[in-house]
Structure formats: structure tokens, C-alpha cells
């Protein structure tokens, strides 16, 4: 039972220790961007991914899962509309950030 408790209460730093070092700077950039969207942004550290939500309704707007050489993002604008994006290490963040911003602004 204590193992389950520990996994469920992992910090972002603990999560990143298990991730490929190549994707860590990109993960950090995405995390910083998500928190910049508003004071109501919360992160939920899961076993293999980090989910960013609006706190008042705990509606997630982006699910971020590190891979070996990329990051897999599921961006949710509504309960019925989810877009999957694979972000490579050398890819420009501007378009992806705009998709995340739009999801944050439209999710209820």
C-alpha cells in the first residue's frame, strides 16, 4: 500500500528522473508554458505522463507523455475533441503552444 501511495504522490522531479535525459529540456519548456497560462493550472503526475488541468473543474487540457526521442501530447479542447501531437526534439514549439493555449481557453 505504501508503494501505491508513493507512486501517486510523486513529484515532477521524481517523474523526470525516470525520463530520457534527451526529452527533459522539452518537457520542462512545456511545463513552464502550461503554468504560464493561468494561476488555476494544476499538474497531475501519473505513472508515465503529466496531465495539466484547470483546477476549478479538474478538466485536463493537455496530457504530456515523454517518449525516447519525442513527446506525445494529447490536447483536449472539449470532451469530444482530442488531438494527438508528437513533438520531436528539434521541432519548433510555437504551433504546439498555440494548440495548448487554445485548448486551455476553450475547455470547460
Positions of the model-derived regions?
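Charge-dense, helix-prone N-terminal extensions
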Residues: 1-108
